[in-house]
């Protein structure tokens, strides 16, 4: 029997607010354990939560970006369960009335675009963290308690592990473009749980699902789903029954292992939080937030192709990260040439970032400086070869390209008389090659060009060199 994979994803996106969701404690990652805490975080008697307005606005931004309907009235609820790192004994979340409903994402995992529907996006607070690797004891760090999250729940529309990771990458791209999260999976800013099941091909009814946790990279999401699908297939083909449970992905062993029985919604005994008023989103807030939305990757890539005349592939790569797209546009603004700017950013800049393990935001060559370098190439002041030398020197100081060219004496030589003198010397020093060229070995033209450029240390204007050589060789 042939089976079809069915996957739905629950993604927790940690918001980059300065303070937590329901108190004024810092939400900064990496602080000493239990230093970002207050009576609200610890659920001490009499401590009352107050919702962070920025959390609501970020939820609305993501909802609008994913085509959701925004609820004018939504309710915060208590999700009740016991866990050592949850001091309150409940988590503030949303249940029956979430803030965003019925959206979608378009993804392309290599087989054309596909629509993945979203059930909901809702506001939630994070729990604390259990630490098991200090001696034989377990410690609790509650710094993360109350850090704001958005949970994005998809319909089970995903049919391959690649689709799942592509969906997750697309979602990460959107939250980063919106500026609401850094989307860092390794630090837990973006966490993904996958609900996996199999069903016979052609069946409409879903099979029994298992939930997979602890996947901290796109590659691990793919591997975990593929492993779990094969585990299900093996059980079903042997006539067994799938147990509905939560399983942990072990990246070292490349397998999932049972964690606990899968809970149902009624196990959490949701009810509206009596300490928090309903969340209201009016038309004025929606109008304001719509105006604040950025130009998203697909639209920006299309504009790059049309406005700057660059290839579709280049535009897609340049718009993967908002910061890279911003950098490119700032370069073009100074350089005035979209195609050459694209070549430099896609080539020298990205190569340097990869070699030095840098992010574009930490790159030492500001876009205005790179734009200035490209202008020098366009004006004929320097050659492409010299420009690459200047680019390397620009990474070592704050000097402009023009200042470096003047300081190092790298200006391009276009003086016909000087170039003619060098060409005459090269031809005189290589009589055999000259004779060979005149006998029809035209590929030797490149040899003469190389000799001239080497003699003039790369500073000769290639166009003038070619013209002079052509004239001398044919004379």
Swiss-Prot record:
Pfam families: GatB_N, GatB_Yqey. Keywords: ATP-binding, Ligase, Nucleotide-binding, Protein biosynthesis. It catalyses: L-glutamyl-tRNA(Gln) + L-glutamine + ATP + H2O = L-glutaminyl-tRNA(Gln) + L-glutamate + ADP + phosphate + H(+); L-aspartyl-tRNA(Asn) + L-glutamine + ATP + H2O = L-asparaginyl-tRNA(Asn) + L-glutamate + ADP + phosphate + 2 H(+). GO terms for molecular function: asparaginyl-tRNA synthase (glutamine-hydrolyzing) activity; ATP binding; glutaminyl-tRNA synthase (glutamine-hydrolyzing) activity. Its EC number is 6.3.5.-. Coiled coil: none annotated. InterPro entries: Asn/Gln-tRNA_amidoTrfase_suB/E (IPR017959), Asn/Gln-tRNA_Trfase_suB/E_cat (IPR006075), Asn/Gln_amidotransferase (IPR018027), Asn/Gln_tRNA_amidoTrase-B-like (IPR003789), GatB (IPR004413), GatB_C_1 (IPR042114), GatB_Yqey_C_2 (IPR023168), Gln-tRNA_amidoTrfase_suB_CS (IPR017958). GO terms for biological process: glutaminyl-tRNAGln biosynthesis via transamidation; translation. The keyword Glycosyltransferase does not apply. The keyword Protein biosynthesis applies. It comes from the Bacteria. Gene3D superfamilies: 1.10.10.410, GatB domain, N-terminal subdomain. SMART domains: GatB_Yqey. Belongs to the GatB/GatE family. GatB subfamily. This is Aspartyl/glutamyl-tRNA(Asn/Gln) amidotransferase subunit B. It comes from Chlorobium luteolum (strain DSM 273 / BCRC 81028 / 2530). The gene is gatB.
